[in-house]
């Protein structure tokens, strides 16, 4: 099979380029995109990409495949190849360190802004802080984020303002703790989100929903935060 992969080594290359690669695919097998990259790397060890778990858990191998962000390890080639063509690029909107490896620093800075951890100023209980089944169920679809950055790097608002806009991944986690019955920092969290580059920078394009490998819905979470902010102001 032939495919094209983005190549760029800032130590030696003046500009990025696309490299055509041909690998031998076992007959009758639908490989994952990561398998193609591994086969290509066996031919050219200088090809650089991130990967770890191979099961869609670690979130380290996010790439852009024929214009769609996703995890290479759980994306079948047949899902993204079009007329036998496949182009693999790094996640868009982030500085490239080398080939398919991007600098995630800005992404994690935005994530850190929302304080993605439980805040509770009450005296610690003798045992764990309990939740009812209904309270626990409110967190489903919020806590499963694996920080792969596929959503934020598919978002035009994030492309335009990566140093200001929190992005869908961060805002999903902001709502995850706003929705947590054990968290006591609701006012503090909402006050921090009253910012023109927070939830109201989202344009509802829903690219984030389309590319999330965990089938989460950051757009819905952002809408919930907007509702809370509006109710807080009345």
Task: Set out the residue ranges of the language-model regions.
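Short strand-turn-strand beta-turns centered on an Asx-Gly dipeptide
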Residues: 24, 64-68
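Short structural boundary motif marking the start of a folded domain
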Residues: 1-3
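Short polar catalytic/cofactor-binding loops
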Residues: 5-11
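Short beta-strand scaffold segments in enzyme catalytic cores
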Residues: 62-63, 155
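Short, structured protein-protein interaction patches enriched in aromatics and acidic/basic residues
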Residues: 53-62
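Ferredoxin-type iron-sulfur electron-transfer modules in oxidoreductases and energy-metabolism complexes
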Residues: 30-45, 84-234
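Glycine-rich phosphate/adenylate-binding loop and adjacent beta-alpha elements
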Residues: 68-88
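Short, contiguous acidic and Ser/Thr-rich linear segments
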Residues: 18-31
């Amino acid at each position: 099979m032939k495919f094209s992969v983005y190549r760029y080594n800032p130590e030696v290359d003046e500009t990025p380029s696309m490299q055509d690669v041909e690998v031998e695919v076992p007959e009758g097998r639908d490989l994952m995109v990561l398998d193609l990259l591994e086969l290509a790397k066996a031919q050219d060890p200088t090809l650089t990409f991130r990967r770890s778990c191979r099961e869609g858990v670690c979130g380290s191998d996010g790439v852009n495949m024929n214009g769609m962000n996703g995890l290479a390890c759980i994306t079948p080639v047949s899902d993204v190849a079009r007329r036998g063509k496949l182009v693999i690029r790094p996640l868009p909107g982030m500085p490239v360190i080398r080939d398919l490896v991007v600098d995630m620093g800005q992404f994690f800075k935005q994530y850190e802004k929302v304080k993605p951890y439980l805040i509770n100023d009450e005296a610690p209980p003798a045992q764990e802080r309990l939740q009812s089944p209904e309270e626990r169920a409110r967190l489903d679809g919020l806590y499963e984020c694996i920080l792969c950055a596929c959503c934020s790097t598919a978002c035009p608002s994030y492309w335009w303002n990566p140093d200001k806009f929190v992005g869908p991944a961060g805002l999903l986690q902001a709502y995850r703790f706003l929705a947590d019955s054990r968290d006591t920092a609701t006012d503090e969290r909402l006050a921090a989100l009253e910012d023109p580059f927070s939830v109201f920078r989202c344009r509802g394009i829903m690219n984030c929903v389309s590319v999330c490998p965990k089938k989460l819905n950051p757009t819905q979470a952002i809408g919930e935060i907007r509702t809370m902010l509006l109710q807080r102001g009345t």
